[in-house]
């Protein structure tokens, strides 16, 4: 059970602190709207997958439009067709998000985590150095790798598969962290979702998140994710007997994720 201190009152030099019992909550809010209502030092784990800020600037979406309009494949110097003919336009949730937005959220993560609380953030592998710098106030930085056992075979005939793994950084807000594991390499092999089970472009593995939650928290602890998307973090917390506070601003994904967690069809 998690109790949040909501206010303090002083009468005749005596201070009384008022608390409320925290229950799991899945809400339609932006990241800062959600995080701003969370008291400081009250969260055991932030487990999240923010927008990777990769939709714009890559040129890949424009190249896809070029092909759709009847344009020719651009030849790679090695003579092969350009293997990047895929859109990376994940929608408004990624297009409008910036590094400054991520930095504001990370500052809030640090505020709301208890001493010894953990933060795990999945992010674009090519921007991991930037993420590490944003997490400089945290300690015990470690890499986590999700190896996909059934990756989409992009570039399969040209080079190594380009989407066969994802990287996260795990770190701690001072204090002694909860870590229910030993000799852990931080490498996890799980499949991605396909077909009707997949409705979000960056949907994460449920068993992966269940394993991470069990290692970094104990039953009854509170897990926060302000970018819950498909609802995976909330469902993983629910399945492992943890409390969750999760937010999603998109109408479409909020409803789909909420229905998934609440098992509404």
Language-model segments: residues:
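Core catalytic lobe of class I
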Residues: 1-4, 10-254
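Class I S-adenosyl-L-methionine-dependent methyltransferase module
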Residues: 126, 262-265
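Conserved SAM-binding loop
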Residues: 257
């Amino acid at each position: 059970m998690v109790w949040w201190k909501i206010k303090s009152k002083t009468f005749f030099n005596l201070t009384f602190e008022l608390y409320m019992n925290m229950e799991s909550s899945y809400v339609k809010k932006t990241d800062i709207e959600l995080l701003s209502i969370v008291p400081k030092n009250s969260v055991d784990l932030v487990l999240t997958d923010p927008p990777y800020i990769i939709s714009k600037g890559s040129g890949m979406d424009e190249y896809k439009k070029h092909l759709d309009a009847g344009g020719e494949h651009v030849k790679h110097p090695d003579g092969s067709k350009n293997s990047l003919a895929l859109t990376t336009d994940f929608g408004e949730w990624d297009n409008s998000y910036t590094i400054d937005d991520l930095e504001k959220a990370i500052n809030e993560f640090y505020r709301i985590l208890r001493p010894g609380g953990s933060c795990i953030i999945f992010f674009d592998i090519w921007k991991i150095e930037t993420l590490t710098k944003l997490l400089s106030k945290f300690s015990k930085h470690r890499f986590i790798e999700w190896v996909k056992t059934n990756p989409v075979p992009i570039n399969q005939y040209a080079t190594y598969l380009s989407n066969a793994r994802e990287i996260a950084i795990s770190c701690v807000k001072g204090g002694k962290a909860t870590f229910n594991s030993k000799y852990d390499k931080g490498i996890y092999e799980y499949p991605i979702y396909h077909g009707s089970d997949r409705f979000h472009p960056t949907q994460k593995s449920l068993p992966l998140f269940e394993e991470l939650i069990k290692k970094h928290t104990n039953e009854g602890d509170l897990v926060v994710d302000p970018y819950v998307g498909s609802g995976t973090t909330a469902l993983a917390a629910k399945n492992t007997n943890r409390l969750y506070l999760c937010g999603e601003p998109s109408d479409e994904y909020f409803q789909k994720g909420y229905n998934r967690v609440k098992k509404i069809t």
